[in-house]
From Swiss-Prot:
Record Pfam families: Ribosomal_L13
A single GO molecular function term of this UniProt record: structural constituent of ribosome
Family per record: Belongs to the universal ribosomal protein uL13 family.
Function: This protein is one of the early assembly proteins of the 50S ribosomal subunit, although it is not seen to bind rRNA by itself. It is important during the early stages of 50S assembly.
Keywords: Ribonucleoprotein, Ribosomal protein
Organism in which the protein naturally occurs: Pyrobaculum aerophilum (strain ATCC 51768 / DSM 7523 / JCM 9630 / CIP 104966 / NBRC 100827 / IM2)
Name of the protein: Large ribosomal subunit protein uL13
Gene Ontology biological process terms from the UniProt entry: negative regulation of translation; translation
Assembly mode: Part of the 50S ribosomal subunit.
Length: 187
């Protein structure tokens, strides 16, 4: 398998087909705006985002985690503990898809069809890894630029602190997936 990483420019996107974006090291909001714009401008283009757990959210780690915890728990009250308010995603792939959804006009047919053409995965699925030539695109404008005293956290770290049991299950599944990937690569 041949893996190639290339920078991606919105003006050079194909009109149809599939584009695979590697989200590692990208700032979540910046990448989401780029993807939302591309989905709206190109109605026949499918975008696949891989490594969603490595997306970055800037800000103090404790502040970001507390914000997520408050967002998840604010709808349950003492008077009505079973209240089912808005469902807030916890997994990194679903969090990122929700961020992109917030940037699309979800009440119009254009926005709904654009969201259907977006796929977000944690790590890289085996179906994608089995391709003979894999081109992973990166968005240079959305990459995290490291500066002194810059505080950031990844979506995986946020997920680990919010839902440690689910994170641990996923971590074990990644180990099994790694073994399968080695088998695919060798045979």
């Amino acid at each position: 398998m041949n893996v190639v990483k290339r920078p991606l420019d919105i003006s050079q996107l194909p009109d149809a087909g599939e584009v695979i974006v590697d989200a590692e090291g990208h700032v979540a909001g910046r990448l989401a705006t780029y993807i939302a714009k591309a989905l709206l401008e190109r109605p026949n283009l499918r975008i696949v985002v891989v490594n969603a757990e490595k997306l970055v959210i800037t800000g103090d780690e404790k502040m970001v985690i507390e914000w997520f915890k408050r967002k998840i728990s604010e709808w349950r009250t003492h008077y009505n503990p079973e209240k089912a308010g808005p469902k807030v995603p916890r997994r990194p792939d679903r969090v990122f898809k929700r961020i992109v959804r917030g940037m699309l006009p979800k009440k119009s047919e254009t926005g709904r069809s654009a969201l259907k053409r977006l796929r977000v995965y944690m790590s890289i699925p085996i179906e994608i890894m089995q391709r003979k030539r894999l081109v992973l695109y990166e968005v240079p404008e959305a990459k995290l630029r490291l500066r002194p005293l810059l505080q950031y956290t990844t979506l995986e770290e946020v997920w680990r602190s919010i839902d440690p049991e689910a994170w641990e299950k996923w971590r074990r599944a990644v180990e099994v997936w790694g073994k399968k990937l080695k088998q695919v690569a060798s045979g």
